[in-house]
Curated annotation (Swiss-Prot):
It comes from Oryza sativa subsp. japonica (Rice). This is NAC domain-containing protein 71. Residues 230-242 have a biased composition (Basic and acidic residues). Transcription activator that binds to the promoter of the stress response gene LEA19. Involved in tolerance to abiotic stresses. It comes from the Eukaryota.
Length: 329
């Protein structure tokens, strides 16, 4: 199929090439001035946009998008690329990976997008894999020779990029003023009927999800959260949430003063194993604290030698031990 024509594929087909296929059949042909088999990769200057604005500029894709982009240099006569993009910047992470065997044809670099201005940018979930040709002379002398040939952009200045979000959704991070603080788009939240929760700082930053609106950070699994009302409302019980599969936490109604010795109005939570029977035998309910938890003082007492004598029938075996424990150190 001629490059530039309409791409017609049956339903169910996805563009999901490997690293070697991206380099051999797309990057090398692009840098060699050869046409591609199908127009599946758009030419976009990635450093003019935020990553969440790129999916709509791609030829296609659902959770990852591919682009040919020119290499923008930080300095006119240098080789260091300019990583500023949109309202943030891309930052390299990890080591470069050679692509091709036995000889590397290209270099794969992983980058993470930070919203805001360095060095206070907020790390996002947007990832870019940049593929560039290996063993290419990008020195100032080579570029000067290229300009003398009236080439505004050398073919080997093209890079192939894969963009995706680790969460599989389109997250938007909006900045205010000079990009010092990164905040969600409140106007977009109001338009979508989303919600913005409390909290501050980068760790609690809310983001806009194109599929799910706004979200707050959810508690991690294995966390217990008691949502208890005020002390004035003694009839309302604390709500217990748990992800643990080892036991079931059952909320019981407040016992009446006639049910337990000592009387009083106490809230309590009863924990019983799965498939087992409830009840804590031997618990002094009069010792229940105001916070709703049972404190059995007998659990913290040191057994006396007499108790061991009754258990073992002869306390002589434990006499020396208790004599030693009672000595000051």
């Amino acid at each position: 199929m001629e490059c530039g024509g309409a791409l017609q594929l049956p339903p169910g087909f996805r563009f999901h090439p490997t690293d070697d296929e991206l380099v051999m059949y797309y990057l090398c042909r692009k840098c060699g001035g050869l046409p591609l088999a199908a127009p599946v990769i758009a030419e976009v200057d990635l450093y003019k946009f935020n990553p969440w604005d790129l999916p709509e500029r791609a030829m296609g894709g659902e959770k990852e998008w591919y682009f040919f982009s020119p290499r923008d240099r930080k300095y006119p006569n240098g080789q260091r690329p300019n990583r500023a993009a949109g309202t943030g910047y891309w930052k390299a992470t990890g080591a470069d990976k050679p692509v091709g065997s036995p000889r590397a044809v290209a270099i794969k670099k992983a980058l993470v997008f930070y919203a805001g201005k360095p060095p206070k940018g907020v790390k996002t979930n947007w990832i870019m894999h940049e593929y560039r040709l290996a063993d290419v002379d990008r020195s100032a002398a080579a570029r000067k020779l290229s300009k003398s040939s009236h080439n505004a952009l050398r073919l080997d200045d093209w890079v192939l990029c894969r963009i995706y979000n680790k969460k599989g959704v389109i997250e938007r991070y909006d900045t205010v003023d000079a990009g010092e603080d990164v905040k969600p788009a409140a106007a977009a939240a109001a338009a979508k009927g989303g919600r913005i929760g409390g909290g501050g700082g980068a760790a609690a930053m809310k983001v806009e999800l194109s599929d799910y609106g706004f979200y707050d950070q959810e508690p991690e699994s294995e966390m217990l959260c008691f949502d208890r009302s005020g002390s004035a409302d003694r009839d309302s019980m604390p709500r217990l949430h748990t992800d643990s599969s080892g036991s079931e936490h059952v909320l019981s109604p407040s016992p009446s003063p006639d049910d337990f010795p000592g009387g009083g109005d106490h809230d309590y939570a009863e924990s019983q194993p799965s498939g087992g029977c409830g009840g804590w035998p031997g618990v002094d309910w009069a010792a229940v604290g105001d916070d709703g938890f049972v404190i059995d003082s007998s659990l913290f007492e040191l057994p006396s030698p007499a108790a061991f004598s009754r258990a073992a029938g002869d306390g002589a075996a434990f006499g020396d031990m208790f004599t030693y424990l009672q000595k000051p150190f």
